[in-house]
Design a protein with these regions (language model features):
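Class II aminoacyl-tRNA synthetase catalytic cores and aaRS-like
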Residues: 1-115
Length: 115
């Protein structure tokens, strides 16, 4: 008998928000039938959370706190990937989208507005 997994909990979460819920989360197995390789597996665990009216800075802080908690629970002092290392307990650098484009792609995003 065929078995099915969600591709994303986003639609169900947005329906709950539209129905008046203010704070929700979903943690569960999801499926994406796309690329497959050492960095991509079709089945994985996804966390999504929403808070109505919350500033994006608070959500960025949530992400930093979540990474620090995951590292602490795993007993890790740092995260390493492809020769790079990050301290999950340090205050993260915050960039605007325009700053990220300039730094990492050499594109002045603001200069393209109205061009």
């Amino acid at each position: 008998q065929p078995l099915y997994l969600h591709t994303s909990p986003e639609f169900a979460c947005k329906k709950l928000l539209a129905a008046g819920e203010k704070r929700i989360f979903s943690l569960g197995s999801v499926y994406r039938n796309r690329e497959r390789g050492p960095l991509h597996h079709p089945e994985f665990t996804m966390l999504e959370w929403y808070r109505v009216g919350e500033a994006y800075e608070r959500l960025m802080a949530d992400c930093a706190e979540f990474l620090a908690l995951a590292a602490a629970k795993a007993g890790a002092k740092s995260f390493r990937f492809r020769g790079r290392e990050a301290d999950p307990f340090a205050e993260p650098e915050r960039l605007s989208v325009a700053e990220a484009f300039m730094r990492h792609a050499g594109i002045d995003l603001l200069a393209t507005v109205g061009a």
